[in-house]
């Protein structure tokens, strides 16, 4: 180990704007996936071990879009199986799980339970670092993952009420996730992702979604 991680309290102080740390806190493993390096995987893992990041990043077991978990078949984002060939020839941003908004009632009626016992498959013991519960796919990311990017951007204008209902259900799931992260992981913060901006501007008009993000 070439550097020692910053203590939890120092990072918390920086994040909360109460003071500085002995150096800039670093989260450097976000896009460093050792298996992606093929025959250099061991070398990359060793490098990451030499330069540990200043937080324990703890992921959650996200529902799959179509496939439930063995111990909870309804722990999935939509309440029906993937049609055969649905993804053939389609990029990840052009796949449409919710093909028509008439399916929304069933999706919401069978929305995954945020009290699912396996929500946090790994609960590592505190190691002295700041603890981050990691959530992939914020509101808009989950929206386009279910509707496809082009449909999602049009939905803001053509089906705003349906979008709000979907976001409401997703927000309720996320709020319970937040509570459990604090209770079960003693998380200091939530690290979540969303597709809100481009290199030059926000991705869509803030007027469309500010109320959904306010909570």
Where are these regions (language model features)?
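Active-site loop segments of alpha/beta catalytic cores
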Residues: 1-39, 102-215
């Amino acid at each position: 180990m070439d550097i020692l991680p910053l203590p939890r309290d120092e990072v918390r102080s920086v994040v909360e704007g109460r003071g500085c740390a002995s150096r800039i806190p670093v989260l450097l493993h976000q896009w460093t996936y050792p298996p992606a390096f093929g025959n250099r995987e061991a070398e990359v893992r060793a490098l990451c071990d030499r330069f540990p990041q200043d937080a324990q990043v703890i992921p959650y077991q996200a529902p799959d879009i179509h496939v439930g978990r063995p111990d909870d078949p309804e722990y999935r984002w939509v309440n029906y199986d993937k049609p055969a060939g649905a993804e053939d020839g389609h990029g990840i941003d052009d796949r449409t799980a919710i093909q028509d908004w008439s399916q929304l009632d069933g999706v919401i009626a069978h929305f995954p339970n945020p009290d699912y016992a396996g929500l946090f498959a790994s609960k590592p013991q505190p190691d002295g670092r700041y603890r981050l519960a990691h959530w992939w796919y914020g509101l808009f990311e989950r929206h386009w993952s279910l509707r496809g990017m082009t449909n999602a951007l049009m939905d803001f204008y053509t089906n705003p009420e349906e979008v709000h209902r979907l976001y409401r259900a997703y927000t309720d799931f996320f709020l319970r996730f937040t509570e459990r992260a604090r209770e079960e992981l003693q998380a200091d913060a939530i690290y979540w992702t969303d597709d809100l901006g481009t290199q030059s501007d926000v991705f869509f008009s803030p007027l469309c979604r500010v109320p959904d993000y306010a909570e």
